[in-house]
């Protein structure tokens, strides 16, 4: 076991940062540079998160590092003296709502107690079921982009579908790996000129990036359909074709394409389970329907020693995640008597405000998930699998929700086992919330321990610790 992954059974630090993506790395670096003892925990084998995920040496030699700045940031974090615990899964919180419970790469129990906790747990892709989504060859855009960066060609003919600005770069990444992208299907109309699109002129760099993606797709003859969603994936042993229909008119077929790869995703959801276990107050975002922590502009939660940063505070992209991580660290330093430069804090606040403006523009251009997801869920045919882990259909979820006492999400889960598989409702959660009898968006999937699947030995080890009740 490397120095990065070796850990005793109990650890203490000034600050524990959970998640080694852009936000967690930025926060850990700022805190360590100021002299704090910082622990950085991440479940992946190497720090960097999904955004800065670095391929192995053999892939680097073959295709290069598409985000070398991530490797440089990780090197600075290590040089600053941050104790990096790779391969450590934070799966719960002790009864004191302060001590973190984790499992080491070998499955050993690890308890972490720190004066400050920074939750930089990231986000996961928002999936919405459709007939055939369980077929091999149907993947999320994030997985497709990650595998493309690793030099892997997932298929020969693909459709990229869903909603959000992420679809275009994913389609371009597939093209770079030799995949024939036959179409991009966007549920909204973000590329139609209108008052909202004029706001993009205030962000010329982002506009140029979007234009470069669009130009690349045009050169390859990729058709971009707007107001279009996946109605059904067809195939026996794997996906063979996809039917696209109008989002505004489900009976109107736009196209049917033969494919062996279908990438579908509707943006990202903040991974806020850990803050919820720590007792942080949360709200429902009316635009996305997501449960988000209630935070100050610097990421401080309702629990004074807990900060939530990056995508866990609301999906907004890597530049915002980096800035949020630094802002939280500077606020912690101010609270702990290590006064940071006030000018730097002001400049960072201005930068965050500018980034927030772009996030608002994106939200205005694309359909609100709080409306999009329920609309798609309502039109699901009864036999469609909603929970792929436990093989639960839309009919079964609707029946459980209509039963007496079954109108909240936990009751639906208890009556059907939907959301009780390995993904713990990360895939089917939005559909469960939309299909419940109480109406779309009025119930949420609760945060439960363990947050992640873990070896039974880790739980038994804690249970054998004097004074511990697990």
What do these predicted regions represent?
Residues 2-416, 420-422, 426-470:
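Residues forming the flavin
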